[in-house]
C-alpha cells in the first residue's frame, strides 16, 4: 500500500521539479546579456587634476566590446583612445563582468545593477554609474 501511494504521488506531481540553472543558456543570462548589449553605456567625470573624462562602453553579444575614452583639459585640448576587449560574466549571478583588454590587462565590473537605463557598479573598485543612450 505504501509503495502504491508513493508511485501515485510521484506520477501526480511531475511538474514539481526544482532545478537551478546556471550558464550561458539560462533565461537570466539571455535577458541580462540582451539588456547590456542593447545600449552604449556612457559616464563622465572630472579627475583630481581638473581633466574631464568621457567614457563609452559597448558590449556585443559575441563577447567582444569597445571602450572609448576622451580626456579634455580646461583649455579645450583633448585626446581620444579606443580599446577593444573581450568580456564574460564573471559570476553565476550575472553581477560581475571581466573585461580582457589583452596582454594580461583586465578590468572588473562588480556588484552590477542594471535597470531603468542605468548600470551602476564598481569598476576596478571605484563606484561608477553609466547611463544608456
Each predicted region: which residue ranges?
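Sec-dependent signal peptide recognition
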Residues: 1-6
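C-terminal motif of bacterial Sec signal peptides marking the signal peptidase cleavage site
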Residues: 12-15
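Lipid interaction determinants
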Residues: 17-84, 91-133
